[in-house]
Structures are given as structure tokens and as C-alpha cells.
């Protein structure tokens, strides 16, 4: 079992999608549940969002800041981390597997702080491992209103 904590982000406006992505159904199962189950190799799992949905039973942490940006979720995850490393995921990855997490984890080096995949020449910042030591840099970027 990986000692990292997992934080799944269920926020955003889902403008193009039309409804909250985490509530979408794939193969008779909520997308969030697909991701949650793929993360069962980790010791601690949490969901992060602006407000806890009604009848929500998974461990939930409210966004630490009043802003709409993924950096808020990452900041919240790192502030609440129970381990040095966190796996930060968006809620729109229903096909993610433990093998992908293992591959990412094995690719980290001793001197790295972030491990994120690259797909179609784009970095996937809401699917990666982040070390707690980046928190001061993250706080600095938030103070400067650099949210990307």
C-alpha cells in the first residue's frame, strides 16, 4: 500500500459537460467511484470541493480558499496532507488505473517535487504526485494571483 494521500477534486463549473462530472455514470457506476476504487492502493483518500454534496459519504475536505481554480484544490490537498507526497486528481479520469499511479510513482527521483504525466504534448497537472515542500512556492504564486 502506498503511504501517499489521494485528493480527488470535484469542482469546476463543468460548463461544456453540462452537469457535475463526478456524478456522471459510466458502466453503471459514478465516475467518482471508478476513480475512488482505482485509488484503493493508497492509505488515505479524500474528496475536495467547494461544498460537500448532499448525501455524500466519502471523506470530504472543503476548499481552503474562496476562488475557482485547480490551484485551490492542490493548495487544500497539501495543507491537509497526512504524508509528504499527495496524489492530486481531477474527477474526470474514470479510466485511470493503479498501474498508471505505480508508473508515475516509480518515475520520481530523489530531488523532484512534482511527478505529472504528459499526454498529447500537454502536462496533466490534475493527475500527479506533489511533495509538501512545494507549499511555500504555491502560497507565493497564489498571493501573486498566478493561478495557472
Annotate each predicted stretch with a short phrase:
Residues 1-147:
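Nucleotide and nucleotide-moiety/phosphate-recognizing core
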Amino acid at each position: 500500500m502506498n503511504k501517499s494521500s489521494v485528493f480527488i477534486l470535484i469542482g469546476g463549473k463543468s460548463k461544456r459537460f453540462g452537469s457535475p462530472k463526478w456524478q456522471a455514470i459510466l458502466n453503471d457506476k459514478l465516475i467518482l467511484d471508478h476513480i475512488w476504487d482505482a485509488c484503493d492502493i493508497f492509505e488515505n483518500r479524500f474528496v475536495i470541493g467547494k461544498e460537500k454534496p448532499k448525501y455524500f459519504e466519502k471523506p470530504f475536505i472543503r476548499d481552503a480558499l474562496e476562488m475557482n481554480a485547480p490551484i485551490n484544490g492542490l493548495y487544500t490537498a497539501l495543507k491537509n496532507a497526512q504524508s509528504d507526497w499527495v496524489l492530486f486528481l481531477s474527477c474526470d479520469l474514470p479510466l485511470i488505473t493503479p498501474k498508471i499511479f505505480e508508473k508515475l510513482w516509480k518515475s520520481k527521483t530523489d530531488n523532484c517535487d512534482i511527478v505529472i504525466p504528459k499526454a498529447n504534448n500537454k502536462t496533466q497537472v490534475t493527475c500527479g504526485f506533489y511533495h509538501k515542500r512545494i507549499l511555500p512556492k504555491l502560497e507565493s504564486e497564489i498571493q501573486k494571483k498566478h493561478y495557472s
